Regions:
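Phosphate-handling architecture centered on phosphoinositide signaling
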Residues: 2-173
Length: 173
């Protein structure tokens, strides 16, 4: 069937996101995986940035991933806390939304999700990259969307969402 999830982003709440957002989010590490959920208070409260934070959260599109929390954080089967595992047996169903800050239509599609990457799969890295797979078993089979505007294709079998760990805060950079 057609994907039906709908995500709402409240920028004031994102800005003040704590270490323990509640619900099914983990309250500490799972399987040794470092979990880093809060916004960095040193940036959020910095006089140079604090008045820009909410508008900055709306400057670029947002990708929203909705799935059963166990698909990510379950100690035995969660892909995020078992990130070094590879292959189709480590793919989980999810709903993926593209939310454009200007209100123009994005996309909303059911897909498979895996962890991607090499060294960044290690549990010392708190942010992992995702790969989304668009297949008939999840719904439409392909993503048909002008993701890059007039440049390139509008049809996708998969998309990678990279984290760029080199020279990042997570890698001492």
């Amino acid at each position: 069937g057609k994907a039906t999830s709908r995500t709402y982003i409240f920028t004031a709440a994102v800005k003040t996101q704590t270490e323990h957002p509640g619900g099914s989010w983990p309250t500490n590490s799972v399987n040794g995986q470092r979990i880093d959920l809060p916004m960095d208070i040193n940036i959020v409260e910095d006089n140079r940035y604090k008045n820009l934070m909410e508008s900055a959260l709306l400057d670029i599109p947002t990708i929203s991933v909705s799935t059963d929390p166990d698909n990510l954080f379950g100690s035995q089967s969660g892909i995020y806390v078992n990130a070094e595992n590879h292959g189709s047996e480590w793919e989980r169903p999810a709903n993926i939304e593209l939310i454009n800050p200007d209100g123009s239509p994005g996309f909303n599609i059911d897909a498979g999700i895996r962890i991607r990457g090499g060294w960044s799969r290690h549990d010392n890295y708190p942010k992992h990259a995702f790969r989304f797979f668009f297949r008939k078993e999840y719904g439409e089979g392909k993503l048909n969307f002008p993701l890059f505007g007039d440049e390139g294709t509008n049809e996708f079998d998969k998309i990678d969402l990279r984290t760029s760990q080199n020279y990042s805060w997570a890698n001492g950079g």
